[in-house]
Amino acid sequence: MSQEGSLGTKASSFEPQDIKVFHVKRSTRDLETLNKSLHRGDVYNTELIEKVFPRRTKKCVIHKDVIVKDGRVDCDLDIMDEGLDDINEEEFPLYHVGCIVVALMPHGKNLQGKVSVEVLDTRLVDGASRISRTLMDMSKPLSACADFPGYFISTSDLLNGYTLHLSITTTDLQFVDGVHPFSVQLMSIGRFCGEDMKTRYAITETSKMLHQNILNTEGDGELIPRGVQVQKVPDTLVMPEVFETIKKFGLKTNGTLRQEGRDKGDNRRVGVGESPTN
């Protein structure tokens, strides 16, 4: 796999790589133009997986005006807008989160400073829930960043109202409590799938797990909390049936075939599609 296809954060460094998945013109000033530049095919190799699996890739857009309270902004945004009524939970028990794009449009002129936008997974406890943290420029008409988590969530959780939490803070916020300082848009691209190993591997292998600063944003380098030990695993031990699937599709893997009969204490196998640096 190329350098751009690897994780944006390595075990030896907490600084994310600057990558280009979406191609957005620097002159973009509105959400409509931004959305037209975000394509499903940039996240998934649709030519490959559409030949093998039913067409279940979704692009959803959620738009919300947020309110200042105690000098900060917190809000929950659904990862789905609509279209869940026709999803068969038994046939498609999993949803692969391929991409999350957060865009911010200030409601004011000549504003100063930057805001820190944290994207949190509400399924996880504090300290483990952060997907990313990005600085956005309040002086610009539009700021946007993209994250490619590359993990699965339960379709049941989606049907029960799974949300992503946005925490927006700054020391330079020039708005009083109770007003609407900016609009926030959450755009997600994902894919419903079965839970068999063949499906899961093919989808995770053809998606990306990176972070991109799209417009007027910069990562603050704290994607991994300080003090957390990061251990690099040299390889992934792959089960025989999954290894055969990998060869069948002609896909790349950094894993090695897991030999049967190993000692229980030596079972270092991690989830299919996970990076050895996780």
From Swiss-Prot:
Region of interest (Disordered), residue spans: 256-278
Keywords: Transport, Viral movement protein
Compositional bias of kind Basic and acidic residues: 259-271
GO biological process: transport of virus in host, cell to cell
Family from the record: Belongs to the tobamoviruses movement protein family.
Protein name from the UniProt record: Movement protein
Species in which this protein is naturally found: Grapevine virus A (isolate Is 151) (GVA)
Lineage: Viruses, Riboviria, Orthornavirae, Kitrinoviricota, Alsuviricetes
